[in-house]
């Protein structure tokens, strides 16, 4: 039996603020203290985004808290981190981001079954305010329908 997938952090606002076109999985190049801090669940991806720079995929503004037992060689919390994907995948993402005006944001950071740190990236398009209101109205309508069905079954 393998280990379970351990989700470190989740970007719940992303599904509210963006239309998600596609999702991808990428590895993260980390230092030792960053891995230890991630295992303790001390990360935040709320305002982070990914960008293709010089043919490499870089994750910006991801905050990993310094490791408590770390010494003076502890990592910088908000440093840019390299994401590990195949070159052809990076080129495809770069083309989509350039041509359609899409953005790459992380949805969640987790450790897979083999214990490797991974990030789930999403190719997204920003929602306008009226889109968000539409989603909220649809969710409320679904909730009302479910409530009415439950009431009908009780009688």
Swiss-Prot record:
The protein's job, in short, is:
Required for rescue of stalled ribosomes mediated by trans-translation. Binds to transfer-messenger RNA (tmRNA), required for stable association of tmRNA with ribosomes. tmRNA and SmpB together mimic tRNA shape, replacing the anticodon stem-loop with SmpB. tmRNA is encoded by the ssrA gene; the 2 termini fold to resemble tRNA(Ala) and it encodes a 'tag peptide', a short internal open reading frame. During trans-translation Ala-aminoacylated tmRNA acts like a tRNA, entering the A-site of stalled ribosomes, displacing the stalled mRNA.
Q: What is this protein called?
A: SsrA-binding protein
Question: What's a single GO MF annotation on this record?
Answer: RNA binding
What gene is this protein translated from? smpB
List the GO cellular component terms.
Answer: cytosol
List localization entries. Answer: Cytoplasm
| Annotated keywords | Cytoplasm, RNA-binding
Query: Transmembrane segments in this chain: where?
Result: none
Q: Which Gene Ontology terms describe the biological processes this protein takes part in?
A: trans-translation
> Coiled-coil ranges per the record?
none
Q: Among its keywords, does the record have Lipid metabolism?
A: no
Q: Which Pfam families match?
A: SmpB
Cited HAMAP family: SmpB (MF_00023)
Its family remark reads: Belongs to the SmpB family.
Origin organism is Moorella thermoacetica (strain ATCC 39073 / JCM 9320)
